[in-house]
Amino acid sequence: MRILLEFVLQIFRGLNTKTDETVIAQPTPEPTPEPTPEPTPEPEPEPVKPSWPISKEHMAYIMGRKLEEISDELMDDYATCCETFHIDPFSQAYFLGQCGHESGGLRYAIEWHDGSNYEFRSDLGNLEAGDGVKFAGTGWLQCTGRYNHQRFSDYLKFLGKEDPSIMEIGKTYTSQYYPFTISGFWWHDNKMNQYCATIPTVDSVGARVNGRYLPNGYEDRRKYSRKAFDIMGIPYPGN
């Protein structure tokens, strides 16, 4: 009996004895890094356009046109012209008066003649065949000849606005995209802002544009100029 009890006790003790187990710590897995999101590219800034010096309604009134005939692109070009060549409201009145007459109220940005009579005119820089037609009078004040177009193109390049199409295509391109700006270049090149600051008569300004006194169409120049001075709120300086 005693032997049996000892045997049972040994079994009972074995059940309550914890077996030592060696626990090997497992390394904590590294967290999977989240992918870095690609930076969202910032949109290209819109080019800043100068504000229009006058409204489309005012331009239509001065030029005797319907409002729907005055495009935003035309007004943008006018704004660029005035900003680039520092044409202030006083000079703008003279400028618009001359542009109005020379272009038939902004109807003709290329002279009526095809330009063949300018062929090989060295005084205009027309040294290559076809230059007469390609660079015939362009813009409202009819900038004429390879030489003058090249100078206009070079000036835009100097301003950081290079446009090779001016020389590659010629009058059909420039008259569409720069009718005011190429006219403003002539105005600037001939120091018309400085002249207008002396408060000259409209006829004397027309003589500088047209090349003689009294200028061709002087009554028409006066008509456009009167309306331009009226819109600018500036007294008409006289004929």
Language-model segment annotations:
Residues 83-88, 164-174, 196-197:
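Short, mixed-charge amphipathic alpha-helical segments
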